[in-house]
């Protein structure tokens, strides 16, 4: 659980940094994409780990954990898939245009 907590904190800090940059009128597409990708990935991983810990009750529709697990997958792809976010970050890091990297 410590690793999941550390990953969650890392995602939170990426999102905070992106928001701070936006508030200060700084370009933040790379940071926003990293935050979206990290938060989506870790949110999904945490919810699936919780389902695993709770065993059969984690899959029961009588408990909210099943809903959280489904919702985390939707939120993971809502703002663009992981591959799209990774492509945006790669373009920024390598200083390439969308035509250069497809």
Show which residues each predicted segment covers.
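Alpha-helical interface subdomain recognition
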Residues: 1-102
């Amino acid at each position: 659980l410590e690793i999941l907590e550390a990953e969650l904190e890392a995602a939170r800090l990426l999102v905070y940094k992106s928001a701070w940059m936006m508030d200060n009128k700084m370009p933040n597409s790379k940071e926003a994409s990293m935050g979206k990708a990290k938060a989506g990935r870790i949110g999904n991983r945490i919810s699936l780990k919780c389902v695993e810990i709770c065993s059969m009750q984690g899959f029961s529709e009588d408990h909210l954990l099943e809903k959280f697990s489904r919702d985390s997958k939707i939120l993971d792809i809502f703002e663009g898939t992981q591959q799209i976010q990774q492509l945006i970050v790669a373009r920024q890091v390598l200083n390439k245009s969308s035509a250069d990297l497809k």
